Every structure is written in structure tokens, then in C-alpha cells.
Amino acid sequence: MSRPQFDPAAYAAQLEDKKARLAGLLAPFAAPAPEVFESPREHYRLRAEFRLWRETGNENRHYAMFEQGDKHTPILIEDFPIASRRINELMPRLKDAWAEPALGFKLFQVEFLTTLAGDALITLCYHRPIDAAWQQAAEALAAELGVSLVGRSRGKRIVVGRDYVEEELLVAGRRFRYRQPEGAFTQPNGEVNQKMLGWAYEALGEREDDLLELYCGNGNFTLPLATRVRKVLATEISKSSVNAALANLADNAVDNVSLVRLSAEELTQALNEVRPFRRLADIDLKSYAFGSVFVDPPRAGMDPDTCELTRRFERILYISCNPETLAQNIAQLHDTHRISRCALFDQFPYTHHMESGVLLERR
């Protein structure tokens, strides 16, 4: 993780540049002007990861970050204004704690995971085996800080408390509860994520047919979108994300979602009846009347076959973390679908990265 150039005074201009960039990429497809959802200027990032750096000639260690491609010139961090207030409050207290050998010896990396709801988990990574002495010290520290702790060393993982944090997000007047596991992907900007969920909920609209969701992760979008349709079939390949999504569905009493651990390629084969899958043994695909598909793919976007799969739906709701691959995918779909809505979500202030969304509807 490299440190963004934090400059609140430049935020508005940087956001305008992103808006212009997205509009330019989507201009060939006659897209409407993007709806823009701003980020808080500071304390917006709910996750942070730091290496530890020892000063030459003494035992002092600091939180450190590095510019991309340079692992030898540390940027020493005393506070981190883009991170949540909870992370900033925990950083000096943890730094005091690692003076104890049981916690600090050969500690080389620290990862913070927090939520808008105030929960926190800290992962401590070591170049040595962790043992009962570590666990005893970690239990005392977790109680003192009011957090869960996870210790990691080669081949070993010890959890003190829980290995996930609990989040609450408000979408269309309803609070959804999420378990967000340590080590799994979660949206880093909680406030913007909440806005993104609200936009997707509104863009999909109230439907009497069914929704297919690809790349569902921990169910971030699944929970609110499930309230807009008759049934959802959601797919995900990460086992930890599938387990988190199942727990989140149960915690929120959402009972119209079937979740299967299949890749997009495998699902395409199943829908085309190329071959059967044991993981679909309890699911009758012919019972679904799919009208919409929701996709939130990785930075590489959808592969051509998955793009062709989405073409068969009346509505394609697409959230993207890479506007270039979004534009490439839209180019493949443009002959059958038009962009009726698009949005820019500023998940990553002070960087060139952006999250965007489009609703494509059949011509």
C-alpha cells in the first residue's frame, strides 16, 4: 500500500478531472452525464496496512509505507489522516504495546480493519512462530484496546476475539448488517460504499423477475438488491467470501438468495446446459426468470465469454473499479444495450483510481 498525496484543498479539482475522464471514456456510447458521489475529505478509509521500519543504530520502530516500485525508501507514518478516526486512535496505542517482546519481537507488518459501526480488528504479522506467550499478551492487549486481534506467522494463525468485523450500512431506510472477514476483500471507503449501494438499489428498481449476480463477494450488494426482485442466484469463487455471504444472508433474514461457488465461466456452461455441476444439484435453473444481471468484476473486467453471457439479460447493472475495462466491455455490448444511467463513486480520493457504475438496458 502506497501513501496517497493528501491535499483536501485539491479534492474538488481532482474529482472534476475524474468526472471528465469517465465522461470521455463513455462518450462513444452516448452515455448521460455521470452522477457524482463524493467522498469525505479525510478519515474515509476503513482499512490500512503498514510495514514496520527500524531506525539504523537503535531499536525504534515506526509505521512505514512505500511508493509503488520502491521497497527501500520508507515513508514514516505518525498519523494517517485518510484512515478512519478509529485507526488513528489505535495506531499510537499499538505502537506502545509492541515494546513488549511477546508482541513486538520480529513483528514486521500491521493491518487495521475498521467499520462505520465502530468495530475494529488488527492483524499482526511475524517473521517467527507465535505461541502461547504471544496469545496471552494478545488477549490482554485486545481487552485494553477493545478490538479483536489476529496473529499470523508462517503456517499459523491465532485469533483473539473474532476473525471478522461487523458493519452496518443504511440503504433505502433499512439497516443491513455485514460480517467482514479478516483477509477478505471489503470496500475500503464505507461512506462511499453506502452511497454506491443506494445508487444500485435505485437503478435496479422494483422488479417482479429474478436477478443473477456474478462476483458477489461477501454479499455487499446482494443484501439490498435481493429486496428489489423475486429471487437472486449469486455466484462467487472465494470460499471465505462465500461463507461470509451466507452468514450475512442469515443475519439479515434474507431468504430469497441461492448462492453457489462457481466461476462465471462455469455458470455460463451450466446455463447453456453444456454440462451438469454437483454444486447446482439443489438448484433448478429453469425455475428462474432472469431479467437483470449484476456484475462487480475485478480490475480486468469481464472476459469476452462473460460479456456474452450478460448480453442475454434485459438489464445489466455493472459496478467497475477500472473505467478502461468498463469501456471495453460496454463496446462489446453496445450493439444490443444502451447506457441509461452512469455514476462516479469517489472511493479513492487523492489517487487516479475511481469506482463507477452503469445501468445498461436492452435497445
Curated annotation (Swiss-Prot):
Protein encoded by which gene: trmA
GO molecular function, one term: tRNA binding
UniProt function note: Dual-specificity methyltransferase that catalyzes the formation of 5-methyluridine at position 54 (m5U54) in all tRNAs, and that of position 341 (m5U341) in tmRNA (transfer-mRNA).
Catalyzed reaction equations: uridine(54) in tRNA + S-adenosyl-L-methionine = 5-methyluridine(54) in tRNA + S-adenosyl-L-homocysteine + H(+); uridine(341) in tmRNA + S-adenosyl-L-methionine = 5-methyluridine(341) in tmRNA + S-adenosyl-L-homocysteine + H(+)
Recorded family membership: Belongs to the class I-like SAM-binding methyltransferase superfamily. RNA M5U methyltransferase family. TrmA subfamily.
Pfam family, one: tRNA_U5-meth_tr
Annotated signal sequence range: none
Entries under NCBIfam families matching the protein: trmA_only (TIGR02143)
HAMAP family: RNA_methyltr_TrmA
GO CC, alphabetical: cytosol
EC number of this enzyme: 2.1.1.-, 2.1.1.35
Keywords linked to the UniProt accession: Methyltransferase, S-adenosyl-L-methionine, Transferase, tRNA processing
Protein name: tRNA/tmRNA (uracil-C(5))-methyltransferase
Gene3D superfamilies the record matches: 2.40.50.1070, Vaccinia Virus protein VP39
PROSITE patterns reported in the protein's UniProt record: SAM_MT_RNA_M5U, TRMA_1, TRMA_2
Biological process, per Gene Ontology: tRNA methylation
Binding site for S-adenosyl-L-methionine: 187, 215, 220, 236, 296
Active site: 321, 355
